A protein has these predicted regions:
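Short, hydrophobic beta-strand segments that form beta-sheet elements in well-ordered domains
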Residues: 35-37, 90-92, 112-116, 136-137, ...
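A structural micro-motif
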Residues: 3, 31, 57, 87, ...
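Residue-identity detector for glycine
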Residues: 151, 162, 168-174
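Extended catalytic core of nucleotide-activated donor transferases of GT-like folds
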Residues: 4-8, 15-126, 143-148, 152, ...
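Nucleotide-sugar donor-binding catalytic core of glycosyltransferases
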Residues: 2, 9-18, 128-157, 174-328, ...
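Catalytic binding pocket for nucleotide-activated donors in carbohydrate/polymer assembly enzymes
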Residues: 7-11, 17-29, 34-41, 106-108, ...
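A short, gly/pro- and small-residue-rich
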Residues: 73-90, 200-213, 334-343
Length: 422
């Protein structure tokens, strides 16, 4: 019977945050949870060995943390500690498998791959049949109130009072004013200018560059398609049918195409609003390099920050802008975080997202190819406080019930118990 769960911290901040959110629920379910610190491997390794009980322990991780032959869990000639103690390894891959082709090898015997998008799951099962595909588990959200209860965020009231003191305002009225949403539109996420990708497009020769540009142009013209759908069609047309082991390497070498189209549409969404005179607060790196901005005074720059601070900023926003990172049958945590913290999420749709949240249930959908409609949709939301609040209310009821990290932990705990019983 599984009673103990190992998780990872000290790597990518957002992944550590997701892990701690899930750990809260795992502990509520009766599991003992140990966090292995990737920044303190020497001290963590000894504690990890004391924590492990063979056949009672599993690893739950994101993005192959703890599965990259880290010194504390892997030794040359011996292998992974996970294999030594017969530990199942559940890895939630927070992006497409083609980003991880170089990591999808030499993995522990009991590796279990979890996909956050149903089409990504299908791709993994076709191109990596040597590994177990455990299922589809989309990303989830956290409400700031939940973070407050867990001691991870300053209470809303305290933030409001602090702001009132800093600005010289006193009393309940000043605090209430500061607590009201102060960002009309916000986007939390980084931006990379498109010229950054030119060396990758041109890295072989002109013939390959033309091939890559054809794929990019096809994706920009047909944004409902996945990168693999378009890229594989072009590969077959140019080179004929190739074995999957060759194609998966080819797709891995084209990940810059995925990043190009993500940033193209993310930049276009922000630019469209800013050029329409709508102020947009962007939280993350790279936005000072956004091209073709006609109203720079409407582009409000904020530095990249941690997860809890982002949640606080969402709680202070009316509208949260999202462009899906090419998840065509999954969801991004930005969508759920926005709704849980009181902002309407204006986003492009995905098949899964439209099943879970209908129009007006926390979200307003704008197809990428209909970007010209974005300013009017956002203006309508900003001008209708009661309507906007009703959209959030309807969405929050659904998200609180189905799309928190606690719910994801419960699903994963059921899978772990099911696997252990076999």
């Amino acid at each position: 019977m599984i009673k103990r769960i190992v998780m990872m911290e000290g790597g990518v901040e957002t992944l550590s945050y997701f892990s701690h959110q899930m750990a809260q629920e795992f502990q509520m379910l009766g599991y003992a949870v140990f966090f292995y610190d990737l920044k303190q491997e020497e001290s963590s390794a000894g504690k990890l060995r004391k924590f492990i009980r063979p056949r009672e322990t599993v690893l739950v991780t994101f993005n192959f943390q703890g599965l990259e032959k880290e010194a504390g869990v892997y030794r040359e000639g011996i292998g992974y500690l996970w294999d030594t103690y017969h530990i199942p390894c559940y890895n939630i891959a927070a992006d497409h498998p083609y980003f991880y082709d170089d990591r999808l090898k030499d993995l522990p015997e009991k590796y279990r791959h979890i996909s956050i998008d149903r089409r990504q799951k299908a791709y993994f099962e076709e191109f990596y049949p040597e590994y177990v595909s455990r299922g589809f588990l989309p990303l989830a959200g956290t409400g700031l109130r939940q973070a407050e209860e867990e001691g991870e965020a300053e209470p809303l009231e305290a933030r409001a009072q602090g702001a009132a003191v800093e600005t010289g305002e006193a009393g309940a009225q000043g605090a209430a004013e500061q607590a009201a949403p102060c960002y009309d539109v916000i986007l939390t996420g980084n931006y990379t200018k498109l010229s950054f990708f030119e060396p990758y497009i041109n890295w072989i020769n002109e013939e390959y560059a033309a091939f890559y540009r054809e794929i990019i142009d096809d994706l920009l013209e047909h944004p409902a398609c996945t990168v693999e759908e378009v890229a594989l069609a072009h590969c077959e047309r140019e080179m004929g049918k190739k074995p999957n082991d060759q194609l998966r390497i080819a797709l891995h070498k084209m990940i810059f195409i995925d990043l190009y189209v993500r940033n193209y549409w993310r930049g276009k969404a922000v630019r469209t609003l800013v050029n329409a005179g709508i102020p947009v607060h962007v939280v993350g790196k790279g936005w000072e390099e956004l091209e073709d901005v006609r109203h720079p005074e409407c582009l409000k720059l904020h530095p990249q920050t941690d997860s809890v601070t982002c949640l606080g900023m969402l709680a202070d926003a009316k509208v949260s802008l999202n462009v899906m990172p090419w998840f065509k049958d999954g969801a991004h945590d930005r969508v759920f975080n926005s709704i849980l913290n009181g902002a309407v999420c204006v986003t492009d749709p995905s098949c899964y997202l439209e099943e879970e949240l209908h129009e007006g249930e926390g979200v307003c959908y704008v197809a990428l190819q209909d970007m010209d409609a974005l300013p009017e949709k956002v203006k309508d939301l900003l001008q209708n406080d009661s309507g906007r609040n009703e959209i959030v209310r309807r969405g929050r009821a659904i998200v609180e019930q189905k799309h928190t990290w606690a719910q994801r932990a419960k699903t994963l705990a059921a899978w772990i118990a099911e696997d252990a019983a076999q």
